[in-house]
Amino acid sequence: MDDPKSEQQRILRRHQRERQELQAQIRSLKNSVPKTDKTKRKQLLQDVARMEAEMAQKHRQELEKFQDDSSIESVVEDLAKMNLENRPPRSSKAHRKRERMESEERERQESIFQAEMSEHLAGFKREEEEKLAAILGARGLEMKAIPADGHCMYRAIQDQLVFSVSVEMLRCRTASYMKKHVDEFLPFFSNPETSDSFGYDDFMIYCDNIVRTTAWGGQLELRALSHVLKTPIEVIQADSPTLIIGEEYVKKPIILVYLRYAYSLGEHYNSVTPLEAGAAGGVLPRLL
């Protein structure tokens, strides 16, 4: 078995290759969509932002699993070494000049596209926030910001509980419930790279990572938390109907806000708070 440093180098090389492949895919997509087609251009920008966010999150989570005692300097040295290893053989002056010009043109086009994407994403963010403010306002609520640290879903849940419980405990209870109810959750999991269904061992590793890492939580984790708290959970979205999880429970629901464009790393959960003090209450959840 490889030592941790060798394993880290292998992961970094793969991440570099995957980023290059993604950028090539993005360039191909850009060339396939006319700049005059605003509808398709908007969808392209959404798809690009999603793909980049998913890859960034995937790479971050993979590196968390293989962190060792190496300093940041050693990682930089590894990256520099990889660049040297991947450097092409010397070529003619004319060939190098042509390559440099082509590289500069690609960088210029990429810069234009990134600026365009940033502008559009800022517009998507404003539009999303306005829609959510209207939906929440109709219910006498407003959004409450939660840090984007990988724990956002659990922190948003924690924010609405009347008892003291740590994010770590919520993660532990989520993973424990999922492990005890494998048949309820396992069919919905697959490998994001191969699309192969998870086996039992894969699922157990996934549950362990809920506890050990800052892995982002989603709908299945919310389902588990709904059972743990014996409480319905509502997820308000700008462009989709409100998702209700745990409808079989009768307590006052926990309400989360799901955002697609709030942060560059992708999806995010926020909490809510009443617009006015003294809002009507209900039977509040407790950790069982």
Curated annotation (Swiss-Prot):
The active site is at D149, C152 (nucleophile), H268. Keywords: Hydrolase, Protease, Thiol protease, Ubl conjugation pathway. Residues 258-268 are annotated as: His-loop. Residues 1-20, 84-110 are annotated as: Disordered. Residues 141-275 form the OTU domain. It comes from the Eukaryota. Residues 210-220 are annotated as: Variable-loop. It catalyses: Thiol-dependent hydrolysis of ester, thioester, amide, peptide and isopeptide bonds formed by the C-terminal Gly of ubiquitin (a 76-residue protein attached to proteins as an intracellular targeting signal). Residues 1-10, 99-110 have a biased composition (Basic and acidic residues). GO terms for biological process: protein K11-linked deubiquitination; protein K27-linked deubiquitination; protein K29-linked deubiquitination; protein K33-linked deubiquitination; proteolysis. Residues 146-152 are annotated as: Cys-loop. Its EC number is 3.4.19.12. Deubiquitinating enzyme that hydrolyzes 'Lys-27'-, 'Lys-29'- and 'Lys-33'-linked polyubiquitin chains. Also able to hydrolyze 'Lys-11'-linked ubiquitin chains. This is OTU domain-containing protein 6A. The lineage of its organism: Eukaryota, Metazoa, Chordata, Craniata, Vertebrata.
